[in-house]
Amino acid sequence: MSAPATTQVEILQEGDGKTFPKPGDLVTIHYTGTLENGKKFDSSRDRGKPFQCTIGVGQVIVGWDTGIPKLSVGSRAKLSIPGHEAYGDRGFPGLIPPNATLLFDVELLNVN
């Protein structure tokens, strides 16, 4: 039996290479989330307002808590997050099916 898949991070644009978020840091990001079939379910870009969250404290899905700290300020990356590190068996009714792999285009704007 193989180990379950974990969040994959593909850097699309390098950041400053030195300012990486640590657990407890407040991050400001822009993101677009899609399902594997390309259906968009959420986007801070569409709202025209970056999203802020505290990283590494369980405030967001596991895939963000593990993937975003691999980015430095100014980075843009694709996060591929397996269902068990996203919304799991419950999904997000009406938007995300149970155990769905989620794809996020994430840009790390700031770390406080």
From Swiss-Prot:
GO molecular function terms noted in the UniProt entry: peptidyl-prolyl cis-trans isomerase activity
EC numbers on record: 5.2.1.8
Disulfide bonds: none
Broad enzyme group: isomerase
Domain PPIase FKBP-type positions: 24-112
PANTHER family in alphabetical order: FK506-BINDING PROTEIN 59-RELATED (PTHR10516:SF443), PEPTIDYL-PROLYL CIS-TRANS ISOMERASE (PTHR10516)
The name this protein goes by in its record: FK506-binding protein 1
Organism of derivation: Debaryomyces hansenii (strain ATCC 36239 / CBS 767 / BCRC 21394 / JCM 1990 / NBRC 0083 / IGC 2968)
